[in-house]
A protein has these predicted regions:
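A short, acidic, amphipathic alpha-helical segment used as a generic capping/interface helix at domain edges
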Residues: 125-137
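M16 family metallopeptidases and their MPP-like homologs
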Residues: 17-125, 140-149
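Short, conserved catalytic/metal-binding micro-motifs enriched in Asp/Glu and His
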Residues: 1, 130, 145
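Proteolytic maturation boundary segments
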Residues: 140-166
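Short phosphate-engaging motifs
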Residues: 11, 52, 155
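His/Glu-based metal-binding/catalytic segments typifying zinc-dependent metallopeptidases
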Residues: 1-14, 121
Length: 166
């Protein structure tokens, strides 16, 4: 939703701007979510040189700490909400996407949620709600890390320490 768009779900997100554009540490960096009825997963996916892995994880941990401490400004939040609104309107043009959305709505809510109602829900999200979400759900000590390819032992140990809060 809105938190994902702001944190890492687009090219103007915090993750992309900080890790790729400002620090130049990764080619690809983004976040995404898997929502389920009573649970879910929040993922951060990064394509990085193995020698930079610990530095990138450290930057992600710092960004998570920042969003837990500081609220997004209303101006910035409006950009992300409007981005999602436009995306939802565009998706509603596809019959396949509408069927998939309606099926999920039936499973989660017992009825299809009209596009207008969904957009109103997106536009009503506040900065304090996003911060509360981050505080409640983004717990680094519960994070897991997966690497594809060869990761140096030194980098792996540093990543373990970062995820243990050290």
């Amino acid at each position: 939703g809105v938190f994902n768009a702001a944190f890492g779900g687009s090219d103007n997100s915090l993750l992309f701007q900080n890790i790729r554009e400002e620090q130049g540490l990764a080619y690809s960096v983004y976040s995404y979510q898997n929502n389920y009825f009573m649970s879910g997963l929040f993922h951060v996916d990064i394509t990085v040189n193995p020698k930079q892995a610990a530095r990138v994880v450290e930057s992600v941990v710092k960004l998570i700490d920042e969003v837990k401490q500081t609220e997004f400004t209303d101006e910035v939040l409006d950009i992300y909400k409007n981005q999602i609104k436009i995306d939802q309107i565009m998706r509603s043009e596809s019959a396949k996407a509408r069927m998939s959305k309606n099926a999920k709505d039936l499973l989660y809510f017992g009825k299809p949620i009209p596009l207008e109602e969904m957009i109103q829900g997106i536009l009503s999200v506040t900065a304090s709600e996003l911060r509360a979400f981050a505080v409640k759900y983004l717990n680094i000590s519960k994070a897991s890390f997966c690497s594809v390819g060869k990761l140096m032992k030194k980098e792996a140990k540093r990543i373990d320490a970062l995820l243990d809060g050290q």
